[in-house]
């Protein structure tokens, strides 16, 4: 697509120069354009080329996003608006969308009003105390807001990745069991695995 657009611009440039050449031959009084005039023309053409490249890159990203949202919506049988929210917020918080969808599926089954037996809330099953670490003024009902819940849940997972030196397995276990508990088990030489990370990642460890 980009190559085709560049060819269009190049064709326009060649046509313009050809027209100028015919004009020179048609009149003995014609004056060759100065270097400055030609230079401005070339710069203008390259500006057009770069503009087309930028527009094509943006269009390509938009198409990739639309295709991904359609794919995840079909895979998990969830509405497109929820799919788009999970996809966009995961990316904005530094989480791969695939993990974002798997996390929400395991945690809440994509149910906005999900409440666990220990009081974890919403799509990502956050506890209010954890959410208030990021936004101290939050109320319980705020965690049923789609954007708030997804954003803070994914941010919490991203922060756990840093705590556990980018070990995604331990970060997921800490998301489920709590970081203090996972560190305690590891310090005692134990294995904190409880099946949760495997449920998200699809493989045992």
Description of each model-found segment:
Residues 48-205:
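Catalytic glycan-binding domains that act on GlcNAc-containing polysaccharides
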Residues 1-77, 205:
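N-terminal secretory targeting signals
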